[in-house]
Amino acid sequence: MQSATVDETRRRTVQGVALSFLGYVVYALSDASVRELHGALPPFEVVFFGSLLGLLAVPFVRGKGDRWADLLRCHDRRMWTIRGAAAAVGAVCSVVAFTQLPMAEAFALLFLLPGFVTILSVIFLKEPVGWRRWSAVVVGFIGVLIVLRPGFHVLKLGHFAALTGGFAGAVTVVLLRHLGNSEKPISLYGAGLLGPLAVGLALSLPHFVVPNTVHDAIFIVSYGLMGAAGNILMMVSGRMAPASIVAPTQYSQMLWGIALGYGLFGDRLDWVMILGAIIIIGAGLFTFAREKVKQPHATTLRPPVHPQ
């Protein structure tokens, strides 16, 4: 009987990890849709439409007894609002980054997120961090310098947007760790969805651009639907497999980003950028591994790299 239970747990874990990989494929397709828009629509407007279509995922996210109103209900309104604001900043910055940068370069900078999480966890959660994780943070920043090559590489708004997006994502992760035991998952999801929706709508209205081609309409819808589908896959994955096991699969998103950037947009990769990306990924994976060692029974929240 115990053996059957263990086998069932393993089967669900494998299925959960597989769904997670699929989720990051879908997220990468959502990001590629932004790139395909080529800046035809303002970033705030893209975020608004993406969040609006993201509402389609809510029925799949709702737990037993959850209501639509629970998207707005919370115990700590101030932290809930900050969570929504961080999600909005991350969404807008990721759209700017994927519009202006090669996909692999944008992902490399966004994936500095685990380093930011370590720093914020020490400051706000008073989490003890040893020299190994601090070393990973330093190595991650070295990887960023290699990717950016200041003085040898023309820096764009997209580079700063990607770094800001990674920082905003780290704020979200730290807030989820802080609020995870006191708020319903649907409430936390609501903040991450309604924040970008409200900010995107408010800031896009003064210069609203109606998609005037079928191409633009298709890819703005693709951005939102793929984001919603990715959210659903990740929620189901999280219910089937421990988050600490699923978390490292997020780095597969960079591989898909490289493939899509090269195959669809003709992005060119040089060895310096690849080296920097490998260093950043290695630092992030090491951080996850150390968190699992220090807190083997804790839930490691997956960084929400995707804007939704």
Model-predicted regions and their roles:
Residues 1-22, 55-82, 194-222, 232-242, ...:
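Membrane-interface interhelical linkers
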Residues 2, 255-308:
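C-terminal-most transmembrane helix of multi-pass membrane proteins
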Residues 42-54, 96-113, 155-168, 213-227, ...:
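Structural signature of hydrophobic alpha-helical transmembrane segments
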